[in-house]
Amino acid sequence: MEQINLNMITAFTIALMGVLTYRSHLMSTLLCLEGMMLSLFILMVLLISHSHMVSMSMAPLILLVFSACEAGVGLALLVTISHTYGNDYVQNLNLLQC
């Protein structure tokens, strides 16, 4: 395994551990999710360029589009939660509450 692939897998794992560790605040969770998406993007670009799969060359761009949409929805949710409750705790996101 090449060194850069190992580094990207390590970055993904660290970001995943950050999501699991810092899940009390929404902003920390969003930052860790963005780190995961960035490492997935770099891994996908490296895999496609290494194996010369021309048919999959649009996949990293599609991943970036979904990542931007996820960030936009997450930030809109963060603004709404912080405006309504005054903080960004994930425990305020109880959607089953009547």
From Swiss-Prot:
Entry membrane topology: Multi-pass membrane protein
Protein's UniProt name: NADH-ubiquinone oxidoreductase chain 4L
Top-level EC class: translocase
GO BP annotations, alphabetical order: ATP synthesis coupled electron transport
A GO cellular-component term linked to this record: respiratory chain complex I
Transmembrane segment boundaries: 1-21, 28-48, 61-81
Domain of life the protein comes from: Eukaryota
Keywords (A to Z) from UniProt: Electron transport, Membrane, Mitochondrion, Mitochondrion inner membrane, NAD, Respiratory chain, Translocase, Transmembrane, Transmembrane helix, Transport, Ubiquinone
InterPro entries recorded: NADH_UbQ_OxRdtase_chain4L/K (IPR001133), NUOK/Mnh_C1-like (IPR039428)
Location(s), subcellular: Mitochondrion inner membrane
Similarity field: Belongs to the complex I subunit 4L family.
Entry keyword NAD: yes
GO MF term list: NADH dehydrogenase (ubiquinone) activity
Subunit structure: Core subunit of respiratory chain NADH dehydrogenase (Complex I) which is composed of 45 different subunits.
Major localization class: mitochondrion
Entries under Pfam families matching the protein: Oxidored_q2 (PF00420)
Known function: Core subunit of the mitochondrial membrane respiratory chain NADH dehydrogenase (Complex I) which catalyzes electron transfer from NADH through the respiratory chain, using ubiquinone as an electron acceptor. Part of the enzyme membrane arm which is embedded in the lipid bilayer and involved in proton translocation.
Enzyme Commission (EC) number: 7.1.1.2
Reactions the enzyme catalyzes: a ubiquinone + NADH + 5 H(+)(in) = a ubiquinol + NAD(+) + 4 H(+)(out)
